[in-house]
Amino acid sequence: MKSVLIFLVAIALFSANIVSADEQTTRGRHTEPDDHHEKPTTQCTHEETTSTQHHHEEVVTTQTPHHEEKTTTEETHHSDDLIVHEGGKTYHVVCHEEGPIHIQEMCNKYIICSKSGSLWYITVMPCSIGTKFDPISRNCVLDN
């Protein structure tokens, strides 16, 4: 048994010396530059990048409440009176100038009048939940 142990220790010592010699050789090769060879140089590669310009268009949409009913408009030819059918009711609208106007009977909604030539067109717009149309500021404001 002693002979096996001595044999293993001898192999371990011999292996340690070989590794140690390799480490010294490796270190010598990398740390001591050879005068006959050029020093290693580092080259940085410059990659050119090109970018394509993208044109983005923002589209703003407003979501109408799900409970909103179909609105139709009819134009009358005999007067400036426009008729709005909404929620089973009929409203007569007279536009005097372009822009938003309030119809008292239409809860939380307003109408935008626009003119093209001699014809008036109207668009019914809802205010957001919790707001109402203020005829003075001509905007939807908090419903207090």
UniProtKB/Swiss-Prot annotation:
Coiled coil: none annotated. Residues 1-20 form the signal peptide. The keyword Transferase does not apply. Residues 24-77 are annotated as: Disordered. It comes from the Eukaryota. One of its GO terms (cellular component) is extracellular region. Keywords: Allergen, Chitin-binding, Disulfide bond, Signal. Pfam families: CBM_14. This is Major allergen Blo t 12.
